[in-house]
Amino acid sequence: MKKLFALLLAAMMALSLVACGGSSDTTSDSTDSAAGNTEEPVTLTAIVAGLTEDSPSGEALKKFAELCNEYSGGSVTIDCFFNTELGNVSACVESTAQGTIDIVSTGTSYFAGYVPAIQVFELPYVFASYDEAHQTLDNEPGKAIADLFESTDLKMLCYWESGMRHVTNSRNPIITPADMSGLKIRTVVSATQQATWEAFGAIPMALDMGEVFTALQNHTVDAQENTLSSITSYKMYEVQDYLSMTYH
């Protein structure tokens, strides 16, 4: 079986996983089938990078692995990993491109180095509703972005979403953009995200997800923005005083 290069993208919420295999061994596969042989069992490595096992994304990956094994008659096994078990998020994406990891699921910003156009999903308020997001990603706009991965070492399998994003901080309630003036907020390594928060008057600081809780606890940063599931999974409420439902 061809080594699987896979990509599962989170656009804004979560719970839909799709996987596919390669086709470089078409000739040998056809010969084996004609001879009545079955393909040897294969084990794939998959990680939900930057999210915990008990998050919706983590639970979805485990269910995906279970179904793959069931529908393949036991010939496909997926070893599931979570959060930073195989390295930080950026390292997991790079390892997937190199073939060390077979499947990675994480936020769109981590793939900007492969497909810069995907940064459009980093803009706030691009979609007015969940339905609009799904319609966009499931049709031509989403397909156009997915097609750009064909010239990279990654193959995009699907979009999924884990919820609208919201801001937490330890300084003050955020009612208007002016309330963010001078607020040190954690972002991912994304020029689009950083420019967005600067436009709101905040001071963006790029940190890997595995570093965020400690940075908030030590007041290296004042704030972070994430989905409610991530805020809960990482127990951000233990080190943050305010949750602003910004739906960005």
Can you annotate each of these PLM segments?
Residues 128-148:
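A gly/proline- and charged-residue-enriched helix-loop-helix capping module
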Residues 1-43:
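Short, low-complexity disordered leader/linker segments with a strong preference
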Residues 22-24, 35-131, 150-248:
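N-terminal secretory/targeting leader peptides
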